[in-house]
Curated annotation (Swiss-Prot):
It is found in: Cytoplasm. The gene is obg. The keyword Cytoplasm applies. Residues 2-160 form the Obg domain. InterPro entries: G_OBG, GTP-bd, GTP-bd_Obg/CgtA, GTP-bd_prot_GTP1/OBG_C_sf, GTP1-OBG_CS, GTP1_OBG_dom, GTP1_OBG_dom_sf, OBG_GTPase. It comes from Limosilactobacillus reuteri (strain DSM 20016) (Lactobacillus reuteri). GO terms for cellular component: cytoplasm. Mg(2+) binds at S174, T194. This is GTPase Obg.
Length: 438
């Protein structure tokens, strides 16, 4: 079964930077050669990239955790470790990316081959060549690689189509799509046959073409989530022209106008801007009995509606006999020629911000936090402090002393004293425990 998946949650973990190296030159004719430890390589980033061949988020159903590789460690003779390759994740055109931690939309992937960095790889740690000084010409200090970014994301697919087919269930949307595009949607004589959007390309004899999407039937309350409404109303947002199909074969001559108004109400309740889209009213099933009389009643009901600023254009067709179908496609193409393309820059412009995966904003970042465990151990945390800790090579005493100086400079020692920490109290940073000494 070709299941349509249009919303999924994933984890992305960028690679850690490679560790810097502590090394010294050992050459026959170079006495006191000095430090020669190289830097670590950059960790791999996680990048989402538009793949026009994809139509759903189905590939993410069983693969939701993505990890990039770590950078290579620095080497002797001042050689830098290799940087890791970025991990490229293919997504369908029309994918919106939301950060689940902040709730913000961080990217909208609508262009061909568009890329979005969603987790930046850590930079490589510096080797000991960077820490040489007049006072310490042979430092045994090197940095560990910076941790890569971790993010929890929600991907939401809004199908990109030039034309959207809307209407109540079983008005003939799937039949029309199959006739004009060659697509093979599931078609049957009962409601809700279409449970997923179907997409096809219309190719006209004059060389023009456009993408057409068959949206599952809407019902009353769709804008409030009844039926499949909310799930598929989002796909209509990006269509440029709407073909509103109305079934003319009912025994009730006034059913057509009631359903026409109901669909427009659901569109308005979901997003009033949708009613501003160019809309062609398509009277379907004109080959069946009662259809001609019902069409006349439908036109009369519209003419009597004083709330309409403009009478909609009505185009009768029969998808089964192909009556009027080619002319409808020509009319649709003409309307598309006059309708601007979907503007991803302006759509939700106040909500969408291109995510640049930059370093954290130092103004908003808490330098450190101090808490106390039930066993009496003091616990240091905070994004900046933890990042410094992870980049400290604790296997070398000089690196430990440098980290202690960094903590003192950040004000951690004074803050611990203010909290009442005494000599000999245990202090923990992640799994590393040490004694506090005044």
């Amino acid at each position: 079964m070709n299941m349509f998946v249009d919303q999924i949650k994933i984890e992305v973990h960028a690679g850690k930077g490679g560790d810097g190296m502590v090394a010294f030159r050992r050459e026959k004719y170079v006495p006191n050669g000095g430090p020669a430890g190289g830097d670590g390589g950059r960790g791999g980033s996680i990048i989402l990239k538009v793949d026009e061949g994809l139509r759903t988020l189905m590939d993410f159903r069983y693969h939701r955790i993505f990890k990039a590789k770590n950078g290579g460690n620095g080497m002797s003779k001042q050689m830098t470790g290799p940087s890791a390759e970025d991990t490229i994740i293919a997504v369908p055109q029309g994918t919106t990316v939301r950060d689940l931690d902040t709730g913000k939309i961080i990217g909208d992937l609508v262009e061909k081959d568009q890329e979005l960095v969603v987790a930046k790889g850590g930079r490589g740690g510096r080797g000991n060549i960077h820490f040489a000084s007049a006072k310490n010409p042979a430092p045994e200090i090197a940095e560990n690689g910076e941790p890569g970014e971790d993010h929890y994301l929600e991907l939401e697919l809004k199908m990109l189509a030039d034309v959207g087919l809307i209407g109540f269930p079983s008005v003939g949307k799937s039949t029309l799509l199959s006739v004009v595009t060659g697509a093979k949607p599931k078609i049957a004589a009962y409601e809700f046959t279409t449970l997923t959007p179907n997409l096809g390309m219309v190719m006209l004899p004059d060389g023009r073409d456009f993408a057409m999407a068959d949206m599952p039937g809407l019902i009353e309350g769709a804008s409030k989530g009844i039926g499949l409404g909310l799930k598929f109303l989002r796909h209509i947002e990006r269509t440029r022209v709407l073909l509103h199909l109305v079934d003319m074969s009912s025994e009730d001559p006034h059913q057509a106008i009631e359903r026409y108004r109901q669909i427009n109400k659901e569109l308005a309740d979901y997003d009033p801007e949708l009613l501003k889209r160019p809309q062609i009213v398509v009277a379907t099933k004109m080959d069946l009995p009662n259809s001609a009389d019902n069409l006349a009643a439908f036109k009369a009901d519209l003419a009597a509606d004083k709330t309409l600023e403009k009478q909609p254009e009505i185009f009768p067709i029969s998808a089964v006999t192909h009556q009027g179908v080619q002319q409808l496609m020509q009319l649709t193409a003409d309307l598309l020629d006059k309708t601007p393309a979907f503007d991803s820059e302006s759509h939700d412009k106040e909500l969408v911000a291109e995510y640049r995966a930059a370093a954290p904003d130092k103004k908003d970042e808490a330098d450190f936090t101090i808490t106390k465990d039930e066993d009496g151990t003091w616990v240091l945390g905070g994004e900046k402090l933890i990042r410094l800790f992870k980049m400290t090579d604790l296997t070398h005493e000089e690196s430990q002393l440098r980290f202690a100086r960094q903590l003192r400079h950040m004000g951690v020692d004074d803050a611990l004293r203010a909290k009442g920490v005494q000599d000999g109290d245990l202090v923990r940073i992640e799994k590393f425990v040490f004694e506090f000494i005044q």
